[in-house]
C-alpha cells in the first residue's frame, strides 16, 4: 500500500539459510504497532545472542529512528553509518521481539565499539 504518493520499495526475499548475528542491522517491517511503539518500515539492530538468533524464529531488535530527539538520554545512541541513509538513533528503551518474516533486507553490521555502546544503553533499561 503506497502512502502520500510514495512508491513502496521492493525488497528481495532473505535467503532461507541466512545466519542472523548480534549487531546486524536490517530493514524491517514493524507494522502493525500499537500506541508509542516504533513501527513502520525502518532499520533495527539485532541485540539477541547468536544462539537465540539461530534456534528461534523471533529476533530481539532495537528499532532505529532518524528523528534525533533526547540524544542525552542514557538509553539513546546515535549511529552514523554508511549503510544507513541518515544519522539514526537507537531507541534502546524499546527493544522488541520481531519474527524473522519481518526482515526485508540486510543493511550492515555495527562495529564492536557501536555494539558496546548499544549494550550499555540497553543496561539502563533493565
Name each model feature, range by range.
Residues 1-126:
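Conserved functional hotspots at enzyme active or ligand-binding sites that engage polyanionic ligands
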Amino acid at each position: 500500500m503506497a502512502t502520500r504518493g510514495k512508491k513502496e520499495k521492493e525488497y528481495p526475499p532473505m535467503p532461507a539459510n541466512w545466519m542472523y548475528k548480534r549487531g546486524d542491522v536490517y530493514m524491517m517491517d514493524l507494522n502493525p504497532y500499537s500506541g508509542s511503539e516504533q513501527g513502520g518500515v525502518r532499520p533495527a539492530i539485532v541485540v539477541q545472542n547468536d544462539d537465540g538468533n539461530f534456534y528461534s524464529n523471533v529476533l530481539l531488535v532495537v528499532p532505529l529512528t532518524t528523528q534525533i530527539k533526547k540524544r542525552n538520554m542514557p538509553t539513546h545512541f546515535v549511529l552514523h553509518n554508511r549503510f544507513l541513509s541518515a544519522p539514526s538513533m537507537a531507541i534502546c528503551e524499546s527493544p522488541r521481539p520481531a519474527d524473522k518474516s519481518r526482515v526485508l533486507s540486510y543493511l550492515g553490521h555495527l562495529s564492536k565499539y557501536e555494539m558496546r555502546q548499544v549494550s550499555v544503553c540497553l543496561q539502563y533499561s533493565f
